């Protein structure tokens, strides 16, 4: 394979993908329902199959700002819920399905079947869901530059998004067990660092020749360029049970990337987190997945650490002006409140501690999304805490 063309897109445009679980509304068990769902959905629609037949992925339109993205995702999820209800299913999402008791049924698509063949037993256990955000880039070189700058922030995003404390009915003690599971897969996890777009294309040519990847989509790193879309795709995050949490994270990433771009153009001077050696990167990943917002992040090569909660507050202060310019301030305000109110992994554990039931945890995830999708007025949104 020769040079890969990076198809530029409008700077900092946005696209979101969310993976969700298909459930029986009475038993709250997983349902292998993707085939009938696809059968009643128009081609080239917002709905897409996932690796597991009991899961579905939705994809937004290309949007210019977070409010537009939010409106699009709300409309898509309402439509999805209506379609699922007609088929006797309901939906929810989190980084893992808390009370799984069976192997995954792989969606019979050649790419997924090939992945199953390569991954072996790991494919049978693949019951994870992610939130993915695409941000438009003007060129491949800019995408690779921002990729390197954003890399130290990935453990922060992991801690903020952690929503997978349960695995096969057990409390794993991790905030994000999804990240621990995926770290065992050959094409997932921490992305390498590249000098520029040509450096990336040289790497991909070597990897392709070695039989590691066939296409770019075979790369499942937590951060990857998408040349066909002209985007940088942030993939580190657990799926969020609520739309408002997804939008908080999207606004945080959007503001962060725009600020980084300004920094690269000499328009900003403050840059909080810097690249770290691989072993420290791995340790920060582990800490974020294990302790979530209570983790201490290693900031430098001397081993100095600070609480992630404090680092997030510092980042939000730095991003305040950029967020205001982008119209993201209200979302970041909600994100800061959430530092004290509790991320999803904390809420799930509270439900389990009060009920002793993992099924009750699933019911709470279903209820959280249903409550949002039922909101029809600004007054209801304020009461719910949406605004």
Swiss-Prot record:
Molecular function in Gene Ontology: ATP binding; glutamate-cysteine ligase activity
Domain of life according to the entry: Bacteria
Catalytic activity: L-cysteine + L-glutamate + ATP = gamma-L-glutamyl-L-cysteine + ADP + phosphate + H(+)
InterPro entries linked to this entry: GCL_type2/YbdK_subfam (IPR050141), GCS2 (IPR006336), Gln_synth/guanido_kin_cat_dom (IPR014746), YbdK (IPR011793)
Function: ATP-dependent carboxylate-amine ligase which exhibits weak glutamate--cysteine ligase activity.
Family statement: Belongs to the glutamate--cysteine ligase type 2 family. YbdK subfamily.
Name the UniProt record assigns to this protein: Putative glutamate--cysteine ligase 2
Record organism: Trichormus variabilis (strain ATCC 29413 / PCC 7937)
